[in-house]
């Protein structure tokens, strides 16, 4: 039985980093994951929720649930957006049992890309080489809301010629923080500079 996989491309990927969305498609296709891109998808509501505007986030969450309801899995190249769906959608509908059930069910089927590849598909790269020294920074939302920690490391460990160097404070915020970098750019830049110097 083929599973129905939907690709969710977050707003910032769509608007600022479309190459990340295209790379996600390339990765899914490389591993034989048949997927669809629902053209009626919209923002998950995270920017509004992060800004404390929960009433504005709720209609977006309803639309999102309706669009992705018929899929076995929803895959996103974003830990923060997947975290919004999995962790925070149930909070939006705490007073509405029918929508709460739908939100929780969708959250359980929503994955950040690396987690989907490792935890659901059980994939590991084979025949891939990249002779370089690299480090890895944990996404705050991916790590804290989704438990994405070992998955990216497992994928990187399977790459031939790759040397992994531990990043000091790899679990410390990079300064992006969703809307934090927009609201507090000076603090955000200072945090990312410290991270880059590590």
Spans of model-derived segments:
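Iron-sulfur cluster-binding electron-transfer modules in prokaryotic oxidoreductases
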Residues: 2-198
């Amino acid at each position: 039985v083929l599973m129905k996989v939907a690709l969710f491309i977050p707003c910032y990927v769509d608007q600022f980093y479309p190459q990340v969305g295209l790379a996600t498609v390339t990765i899914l296709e490389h591993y034989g994951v048949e997927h669809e891109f629902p053209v009626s998808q919209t923002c998950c509501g995270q920017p509004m929720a992060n800004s404390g505007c929960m009433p504005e986030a709720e209609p977006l969450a309803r639309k999102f649930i309706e669009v992705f309801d018929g899929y076995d899995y929803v895959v996103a190249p974003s830990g923060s957006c997947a975290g919004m769906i999995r962790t925070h959608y149930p909070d939006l509908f705490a007073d509405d049992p029918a929508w709460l059930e739908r939100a929780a069910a969708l959250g359980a089927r929503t994955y950040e890309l690396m987690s989907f590849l490792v935890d659901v598909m059980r994939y590991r790269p084979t025949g891939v080489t990249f002779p370089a020294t690299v480090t890895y920074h944990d996404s705050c939302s991916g790590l804290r809301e989704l438990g994405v920690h070992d998955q990216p490391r497992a994928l990187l460990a399977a790459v031939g010629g790759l040397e992994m160097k531990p990043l000091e404070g790899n679990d410390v915020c990079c300064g992006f923080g969703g809307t934090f970098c927009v609201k507090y750019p000076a603090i955000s830049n200072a945090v990312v500079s410290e991270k880059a110097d590590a």
